[in-house]
Amino acid sequence: MKLFGTSGIRMKNLDPLIAYKVGFAISKNFKKAVIGRDTRTTGNLIESAITAGLLNGGCDVTILGIVPTPVLGFSAKSHDIGIMITASHNPPEYNGIKLFNNNGTSFTPNQEESLEEIIEKSDFLDPSWDIVGNVSEDKTAVKKYLDYILSNINIKKKFNVVVDCANAAACGISPNLFTNAGCKVISVNSHCDGRFVGRMPEPNEKNLVETVDIVKGLNLSGRDFIGIAHDGDADRMIAIDEMGRVTDFDKLLAAFCKYVVQKTNAKKIVTTVDASMAIEEYLKEFGAEVIRTKIGDVSVAYEIEKTGAIFGGEPSGTWIHKSIHLTPDGILSGLRVLEMMEFYDKRLCEIMDEVPSYINLREKLPCPDELKNKVMKYVSKEGKLLFKKEPETLDGVRFSFENGWILIRPSGTESYIRVRVEAKDETFANELLNNGISLVNNGILK
């Protein structure tokens, strides 16, 4: 039974029986679990089901209630395992389960496969009275997290910030932390509602229209508000600059990488195969190495640990700040954007305008799951002949050129193959995209 995808388990109308089985499987190897959840309407149901499975197997459970993923990851340090019930940016009918080690990192694919094997082999016997685990609540977890983050940031300037919580797990916590950091805060969509009545939890330009209007309106009088918007579990964020522009994920990541290198003299930065070449261009003058890894925060965290890098990030807004903790943290990332602005003594819009802009094109092509492996082999072989380049196969198939690159990669959650290109001019970008589409379509037909 394949349950885990690229970011834990994530399903429409997640069956509580699956959650029960996952809990029982976890109890085979872990005896102290902590559980958090986002605001989705099925959160209580899934929490109860997974708790029942854990207790049946003799695992003690600590319940945090509604908390962001970074709070859960931080709390996992005092337990054997952390369990976050969330579907992140997906619509309200979805829910999911994401697992964390007690160092704050997400479970690896190997760990997830081991759990799937246990689920396949388990008979889920009735509980025995003498091994059933205990349940407790921890009402101090959020305060411990807030105190820890505040002790690790240093912002002297009084910034004006609109914090958009998406009616999700960041509610109360993110606005509170920004306020305690000395900011003037206006919170938006900051009451918990698992129907996501204010906006859908994906923090993109389409969903942030009203928040952008609020930032623009506040800045008519020259007050220089920026916006920080979270997803469903607040492991990610995106910023809105003083001009009311939703910042490009790639450009914001490139700007922050430069800040980390300049401030700390870091020699290594970790990012993923789908991140912009602007990062290399931007860091070239500082001699910092850009290490690319597979897509997903677990791969970024692993590479950070392996290489000794102090920061790693994905162009989805998922950033990991090793000096503070290894769990992706959208609330901390928002605060560190303010640190960057203070360091340069510039408005966010000025910082963003300095980052190189390239042409980015994306296409997703329908492909049956059973054909994906065959198609990717075709893409690698024929792409090598077409582009006269060796393919990079770390995650999908990527071909890099002096003026751009193309990445062709099967989706881990949908029946699609995604094509992404980046280039310094539009003609080359369109050429790469058309070639990529042809490779995939021909691979399906072969």
From Swiss-Prot:
Transmembrane segments: none annotated. It catalyses: alpha-D-glucosamine 1-phosphate = D-glucosamine 6-phosphate. Disulfide bonds: none annotated. The active site is at S88. Its EC number is 5.4.2.10. Activated by phosphorylation. One of its GO terms (molecular function) is magnesium ion binding. It is an enzyme of class 5 (isomerase). The keyword Nucleus does not apply. InterPro entries: A-D-PHexomutase_a/b/a-I, A-D-PHexomutase_a/b/a-I/II/III, A-D-PHexomutase_a/b/a-II, A-D-PHexomutase_a/b/a-III, A-D-PHexomutase_C, A-D-PHexomutase_C_sf, A-D-PHexomutase_CS, Alpha-D-phosphohexomutase_SF. The keyword Cytoplasm does not apply. Keywords: Isomerase, Magnesium, Metal-binding, Phosphoprotein. Pfam families: PGM_PMM_I, PGM_PMM_II, PGM_PMM_III, PGM_PMM_IV. The modification Phosphoserine is found at S88. GO terms for biological process: carbohydrate metabolic process. Binds 1 Mg(2+) ion per subunit. Mg(2+) binds at S88, D231, D233, D235. Its cofactor is Mg(2+). Catalyzes the conversion of glucosamine-6-phosphate to glucosamine-1-phosphate. Belongs to the phosphohexose mutase family. HAMAP family: GlmM_A. PANTHER family: PHOSPHOMANNOMUTASE (PTHR43771:SF1). This is Phosphoglucosamine mutase. It comes from Methanococcus vannielii (strain ATCC 35089 / DSM 1224 / JCM 13029 / OCM 148 / SB). The gene is glmM.
